[in-house]
């Protein structure tokens, strides 16, 4: 938690001035009951209208000064809390960018969104309230008690009894509810996760007529959240009635003692009014303090959750130095897997086992296998999205762990299974590949990706707007644009992870032909379910349940690999299976 306080360093002045101005406001408020007592004891008793007007003027002046102090305090507290949450949100987002796929998988997208939004908003609100009330409320409570002693010592003893009782109630509720708020936030994460999952997969839900099932799942999770919120609410709700009971009993005692003191001449009527006002001030401030404690308890629980994300260490460390010379025997190597195994965090079984192969510069490598065979897992090791748990992965003669992040990303471009575009324009999306690319570079990449024709057909061409997620484009258009984006960076290794699944066979064939015709020695990995897309590859890796079932050319695999032969035969006529 101390690390999070570092983000307040730029707002030390505001953190000091906000509570000081609130205490100044409170100081003027403490004089109000004494002025009212004077009005009753002197002005009303003597029927002195001028004296009453003078004292009313003083009350008005105290109110104006108090308002000015309050507004100033609010300005400083808002500046500090908003600035703090902004800095913390930036730091949290920047930290999330350093996390590997492993940490992202472990934490979960919905959890991170909650930390960035709901949790940080709670922290901001809690800090704002804390800066305004953490000194003011105790100051008024103890200040009112001291002022009560200046009025009448015997009556003030009632304050000595009431304040500890009120403190027990307030702090008791705080101790009980603080851990419960953590549970509330955890269950809120679950509800948000289900909501996100449902909205993301809305079309699938409707296609399988599972609307009611999803409603039931949501209602179950929401019921658990509601149950815990009600439990916390019931405990928190005890605070106000208990404090009011104690305060009202104290006021009754004050009136009794005051009446006795007035009867014996120890007090004036105005003094009783002042004491009751002080008791009411204590009541108001303790209610504020109670709300402050509830809000701060929520904020601390949320801050702990944000801190947990900040404390999550990136599982991958990247060196700063570029690796040295390539050994002579590896000069022609692009990618080498040496007895590689991969087991995801929290997974019971390995996704890849004992994978070994070498891809040379300029080769096209096909990767094929059944669903869940480990195709995407294999190619994700090349750009180091994950680290192999066994064996080693090398690119251009050096282990992937020896490359700085920027160097590695510059050498390897990946087109993911899911075509992801960002809100902006076609141009802005393509420039992700290379911010300095010219229009000629962009059009060349679009030509290779078979996307130039449909981009030319758009009224604004490269400047055609793209909605978030590419909602205004078809699946095939999105895939071609993501391929073009990868080509803009002119990588040495291009990975197409089943990224042409939405393309028709003719477009797919044209894409492969265009890739083969590119100048240079770019190594291409094509992950596909279509045997036809891979049969002209220099090598084809056949995966079966995480194992390398076959390695060779199309003809070699048809002759030697039953798994490949079965895949090929299932997609073509049996009579053509050996062709």
Task: Please provide the spans of the model-predicted regions.
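Membrane-integrated ABC transporters
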Residues: 1-31, 36, 44-60, 65, ...
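Transmembrane helices of ABC transporter permease
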Residues: 10, 14-27, 38, 59-62, ...
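An intracellular "coupling" helix at the cytosolic face of ABC transporter transmembrane type-1 domains
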Residues: 10-13, 98-102, 118-127, 131, ...
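Helix-loop-helix
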Residues: 48-50, 54, 147-161, 231-305, ...
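Pre-NBD coupling/linker segments of ABC/ABC-like ATPases
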Residues: 314-330
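ABC-type nucleotide-binding domain
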Residues: 326-579
């Amino acid at each position: 938690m101390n690390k999070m306080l570092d983000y307040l360093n730029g707002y030390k002045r505001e953190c000091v001035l906000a509570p000081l101005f609130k205490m100044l406001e409170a100081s003027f408020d403490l004089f109000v009951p004494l002025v009212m007592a004077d009005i009753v004891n002197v002005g009303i008793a003597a029927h002195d209208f001028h004296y009453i007007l003078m004292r009313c003027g003083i009350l008005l002046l105290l109110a104006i000064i108090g308002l000015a102090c309050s507004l100033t305090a609010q300005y400083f507290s808002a500046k500090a809390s908003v600035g703090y949450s902004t800095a913390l949100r930036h730091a949290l987002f920047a930290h999330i960018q350093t996390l590997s796929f492993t940490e992202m998988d472990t934490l979960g997208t919905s959890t991170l969104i909650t930390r960035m939004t709901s949790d940080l908003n709670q922290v901001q609100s809690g800090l704002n309230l804390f800066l305004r009330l953490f000194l003011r409320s105790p100051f008024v409570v103890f200040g009112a008690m001291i002022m009560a002693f200046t009025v009448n010592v015997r009556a003030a003893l009632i304050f000595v009894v009431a304040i500890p009782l009120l403190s027990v109630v307030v702090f008791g509720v705080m101790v009980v509810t603080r851990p419960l708020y953590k549970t509330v936030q955890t269950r809120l994460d679950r509800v948000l996760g289900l909501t996100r999952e449902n909205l993301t997969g809305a079309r699938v839900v409707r296609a399988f007529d599972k609307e009611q099932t999803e409603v039931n799942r949501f209602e179950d999770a929401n019921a658990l959240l509601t149950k815990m919120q009600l439990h916390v609410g019931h405990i928190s709700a005890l605070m106000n009635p208990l404090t009011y009971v104690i305060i009202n009993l104290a006021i009754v005692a004050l009136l009794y003692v005051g009446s006795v003191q007035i009867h014996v001449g120890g007090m004036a009527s105005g003094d009783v009014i002042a004491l009751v006002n002080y008791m009411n001030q204590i009541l108001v401030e303790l209610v504020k303090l109670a709300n402050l404690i509830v809000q701060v308890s929520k904020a601390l629980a949320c801050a702990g959750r944000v801190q947990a994300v900040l404390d999550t260490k990136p599982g991958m460390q990247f060196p700063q130095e570029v690796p040295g010379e390539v050994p002579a025997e590896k000069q022609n190597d692009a990618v080498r897997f040496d007895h590689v195994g991969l087991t995801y965090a929290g997974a019971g079984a390995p996704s890849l086992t004992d994978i070994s192969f070498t891809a040379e510069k300029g080769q096209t490598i096909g990767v094929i296998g059944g669903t869940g065979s480990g195709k995407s897992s294999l190619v994700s090791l090349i750009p180091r999205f994950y680290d192999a748990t066994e064996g080693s992965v090398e690119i251009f003669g050096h282990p992937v762990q020896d490359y700085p992040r920027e160097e590695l990303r510059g050498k390897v471009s990946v087109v993911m299974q899911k075509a992801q575009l960002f809100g902006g324009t076609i141009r802005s999306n393509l420039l992700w590949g290379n911010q300095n690319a010219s229009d000629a570079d962009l059009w060349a990449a679009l030509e290779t990706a078979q996307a130039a024709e449909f981009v030319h057909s758009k009224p604004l061409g490269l400047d055609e707007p793209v909605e978030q997620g590419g909602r205004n484009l078809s699946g095939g258009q999105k895939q071609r644009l993501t391929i073009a984006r990868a080509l803009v960076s002119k990588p040495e290794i291009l990975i197409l992870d089943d990224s042409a699944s939405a393309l028709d066979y003719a477009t797919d064939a044209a894409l492969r032909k265009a890739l083969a015709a590119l100048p240079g020695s770019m190594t291409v990995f094509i992950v596909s379910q279509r045997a036809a897309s891979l049969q002209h590859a220099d090598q084809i890796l056949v995966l079966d349940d995480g194992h390398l079932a076959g390695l060779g050319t199309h003809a070699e695999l048809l002759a030697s690999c039953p798994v490949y032969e079965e895949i090929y035969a299932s997609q073509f006529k049996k009579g053509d299976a050996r062709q």
